[in-house]
């Protein structure tokens, strides 16, 4: 058998140099590593990696070419109590593989064993890594680098966004290619979006439990190969990377950034009864947080937690992030359950991964957004991330819903959230843009469902409606479900308008959930992670054009208001904001805490948001000057020029003078 040359210990992964392929793999506790190469007939050829530099195993295979299929068998101790679960009978995926061939099916051969090792060989059915070559013409592509103060984020699912779009060619609907289609780009531009945030596109697997129920992991928060694109979103798996980069290049030409939702907190190997794909068999003790009994710390709710304080795992995470920036030109990341990134195991702002990102000349220059919590003790860290990060602002979400749908939030609390939650984020030199304001997200009710359902309806998920949060702050306006009388429909519409206006005209960075501007409903399912069907796909034929136009007008109005785009904290007397009561007078201390839900917010001394969140029609006396109701509020209900606004119940209007 041909012996491998020693090769080089860097970079990690499999890299073709024109003459052959260099293979590298980290494992601090392995005793031997075999590279397994598969020919066109599926015949396996094994080679010991001869190089061992520190904890990096490496070797060079001359004459190997792109398209080569490979995997690893890693030898070492089976000592579960010590956290070691080596099993060379199982073929393992390279954590840095750029392409995977094969499916991650629910198969007992893809398990290593719980207390005792399963020595049945699984190479015949295990997915294989594929060596790829990186040639792509980016032409004159350049990142838009939209200032944070001008950023409008649109959270979308690659498939769900375009799968039912009638104006996109059938053969590319639901794919990376569709993201770059002129129809999609023109829509995003007309809406006013500056950043498209995609749910996970790194290759993921469906949990065995879901597969047994005939379901699949739709959202993608179950990663198995962090450097590989999910092939199901490609027209052809072999060209996935090319298609993805084509889409990014087209979006960049239109001035739209691309932000990836990335999962660095756990892997698809789940708990100890979960499948064995890669990390568990390569170096379980290093990659995961291990308890004293050898089991996993489950700080993610997914069975395991990546140890992002381990130097090698930090290097792996940074290499992954740099890959997406340098190879795919993405403009930033949203980090799922990002508190895990700072665990040492306690959360620290100077945790190793945070420090590495801060010191990286590539990663420190892109947009970084944290979902600032995990499920463990001390996991709620909203406002505590390092200055480079923006954070999902759940304070804003809950306050907006409580104010408009539950009517139980004082004006002072509402104003605090409207002003970028300065009590939470104004620290360590951070700017208002650090607050990623949202009313809805992929996780939870859609905006329409917020006004149509009091209770979640997740029966289709197969967990007897136990999954998903019960804390929704929603209001069905008197009838559970969609449809209803004209009066009911109008009241729900008014609430949607109020929530959208609050989101898009408040200080901070707004994030809009794709489909909310259409009136998309998931029929009360607030945890549709496993629903790859018409429940989650956006139905463009049923989209509300009026609501879409309303949303677009709000976004374009936002861009005209200096107080919202200059990204400076509002200070008393700086002309950015004045808070007034229904008589155009400054609010008293008592009104802030106990007053009626009526408020006027004067922005940049020229734009006025008049709010009547009470149950009664109320006269709102506008400040001195000639005020014009402006789109999307100008119309028969709001006089073109007025000094007094007849504020409808649960209504609001925006004026300019």
From Swiss-Prot:
Report which reactions are catalysed by this protein: Hydrolysis of (1->6)-alpha-D-glucosidic linkages to branches with degrees of polymerization of three or four glucose residues in limit dextrin
Which Gene Ontology MF annotations are present?
glycogen debranching enzyme activity; hydrolase activity, hydrolyzing O-glycosyl compounds
**Protein's pathway:** Glycan degradation; glycogen degradation
Q: What gene does this protein come from?
A: glgX
Described by its record, this protein's role is as follows: Removes maltotriose and maltotetraose chains that are attached by 1,6-alpha-linkage to the limit dextrin main chain, generating a debranched limit dextrin.
Please name the catalytic residues of this protein: 336 (nucleophile), 371 (proton donor)
* Protein name listed in UniProt: Glycogen debranching enzyme
> Which NCBIfam families has this protein been placed in?
glgX_debranch, PRK03705.1
UniProt keyword Hydrolase, yes or no: yes
| Database matches in PANTHER family | GLYCOGEN DEBRANCHING ENZYME
* Chain segments carrying region Disordered: 458-479
- The EC number(s) attached to this protein equal 3.2.1.196
Q: Where is there biased composition of kind Basic and acidic residues?
A: 458-467
Q: Return the broad EC class.
A: hydrolase
Which superkingdom does the taxonomy of this entry point to?
Bacteria
UniProt site (Transition state stabilizer): 443
> Is Hydrolase among this UniProt entry's keywords?
yes
Keyword terms of this UniProt record: Carbohydrate metabolism, Glycogen metabolism, Glycosidase, Hydrolase
**UniProt similarity note:** Belongs to the glycosyl hydrolase 13 family.
Quote any Pfam family the record assigns.
CBM_48
Signal peptide positions (record): none
Choose any GO biological process term that the UniProt entry carries and state it. glycogen catabolic process
